[in-house]
């Protein structure tokens, strides 16, 4: 029982680390997408 619990906690910590990395990557992608959309709009206006 105790070994099982330790295994679960280890897996949860790994998932948490991946989740934080994914949040950072998603934020970066959103920012990049906004910049690209802004640039395309400027091009259309010109």
UniProtKB/Swiss-Prot annotation:
Keywords annotated in UniProt: Early protein
Domain of life per record: Viruses
Biased composition (Basic and acidic residues): 1-14
A Pfam family the protein falls into: Phage_1_1
Region described as Disordered: spans on this chain: 1-46
InterPro entries cross-referenced by the UniProt entry: Phage_T7_Gp1.1
Function: The function of this early gene protein is unknown.
Name of the protein in question: Gene 1.1 protein
Organism encoding this protein: Enterobacteria phage T3 (Bacteriophage T3)
Classification of source organism: Viruses, Duplodnaviria, Heunggongvirae, Uroviricota, Caudoviricetes
């Amino acid at each position: 029982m105790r070994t099982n619990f330790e295994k679960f906690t280890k897996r949860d910590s790994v998932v948490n680390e991946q989740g934080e990395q994914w949040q950072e990557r998603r934020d970066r992608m959103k920012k990049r997408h906004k910049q690209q959309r802004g640039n395309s709009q400027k091009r259309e206006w010109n």
